Amino acid sequence: MFSTLKNAFKDKEIRNKIYFTLFILLLYRIGANITVPGINVKAITQVAQTGLVPMLDTVSGGGLDNYSIFSLGVSPYITAQIVIQLLQMDIVPTLVEWGKQGEVGRRKTNQVTRYLTLVVAFVQSIGITLGFNALTQMGLVKNQTPQTYVEIAIIMTAGTMLLTWLGDEITDKGLGNGVSVIIFAGIIARLPSGLYQIYKEEIINNSASDRWQGILFFIAVIVAILIVTQLVTWVEQADRRIPIQYTRRATISGSESFLPLKVNVSGVIPVIFASSFIVTPATILMAFQRTQGDQQWFKVMNQIFSLQTTPGVIIYTLLIILFTFFYAFVQVNPEKLAENLQKQGAYIPSVWPGKDTQDYVSKMLIKLSTVGSIFLGLVALLPQLATNFWNLPSSIGLGGTSLLIVIGVVLELSRQINGLLMKREYVGFIR
């Protein structure tokens, strides 16, 4: 990894991409510390450690702990993406048609996603402001008028749209997927405070007689992080190599060709999607906290969309598994893959080209996604269950989710840099 970075900084184009990405992240971190006007910052500390705030911060990359202009982060954009991609599955004919139009269709889809992001962000802004205001005994918003709530929602929505645009700029001119990189940066920024929270609760606040137990627990947390990091890295890099043969040429070198399919084809996207799927309804529910908090329907919905309850954690895990299968077929389209192999005169041994190849790849994706989804689900589930059962700090509960995102983004950045370096070497060799 370090040698890759060293070589990357020697190349001017890659170096500029790194600097551009860091510059955008600097702008993001500055915005994450600018509090929305009209908000009582002291009041937000009362709810800063509730289950929703750390979760929303994790999935959005925002700065909800100080109610910044980037409080919602990219969460509304992720929610909009989920909705649009689901509607493209033979539900809305227009969206399905756009999916087949290549770059032109992609631009149209992105435009609709932006419009939907505006709506989701505005609704979430109203919901979360009303909810947090109720939780802080009406102390969050200084001037509690409808106009003030609308103004706050407009500012937070504008922050989301700006952050989404910055993410697109990273994707186009920097390194990695912009949205994932922003979420990654938010998690990294909170990492020191998360570790300090564990250190404070388990060591500093413990009595002298129990302090050794806190020290052992803190060491155990560090060891667990290292072990999970290694496991996630191994699974993220593991792949199934399907042998490929060509009818139109002979392999002079004697080397075999492979079609590599990752064990976790979807990467960290299922975790981000599942988190957003839980957080979005939870933020909207907060708007009804004060008026409907005692109603049965509210209690049921609050159980479902909360990671502090066992049903909520189970649903969250099932969503990760579901999105893993769904996004695997988005990342690798068996029909297009079979078509491209046939055009190149390539085939899988013992498998007929065309429909048989498509079915074979689909079955392989299902098998790989089964392993990948169970692994992702367990990494996200176990720390959260431990937190709920033993009343551990919330940073531990979200540790699995955070690790999955951080490691996934780091590996993706490493792969992209290596790809750019190989491209430079290849171009230099041709010249």
From Swiss-Prot:
It is a multi-pass membrane protein. GO terms for cellular component: plasma membrane. It is found in: Cell membrane. The keyword Transmembrane applies. The chain crosses the membrane at residues 18-38, 67-87, 115-135, 150-170, 178-198, 215-235, 268-288, 312-332, 365-385, 392-412. Keywords: Cell membrane, Membrane, Plasmid, Protein transport, Translocation, Transmembrane, Transmembrane helix, Transport. Pfam families: SecY. One of its GO terms (biological process) is protein targeting. It comes from the Bacteria. PANTHER family: SECY/SEC61-ALPHA FAMILY MEMBER. The central subunit of the protein translocation channel SecYEG. Consists of two halves formed by TMs 1-5 and 6-10. These two domains form a lateral gate at the front which open onto the bilayer between TMs 2 and 7, and are clamped together by SecE at the back. The channel is closed by both a pore ring composed of hydrophobic SecY resides and a short helix (helix 2A) on the extracellular side of the membrane which forms a plug. The plug probably moves laterally to allow the channel to open. The ring and the pore may move independently. Belongs to the SecY/SEC61-alpha family. Component of the Sec protein translocase complex. Heterotrimer consisting of SecY, SecE and SecG subunits. The heterotrimers can form oligomers, although 1 heterotrimer is thought to be able to translocate proteins. Interacts with the ribosome. Interacts with SecDF, and other proteins may be involved. Interacts with SecA. This is Protein translocase subunit SecY 1. The lineage of its organism: Bacteria, Bacillati, Bacillota, Bacilli, Lactobacillales. The gene is secY1.
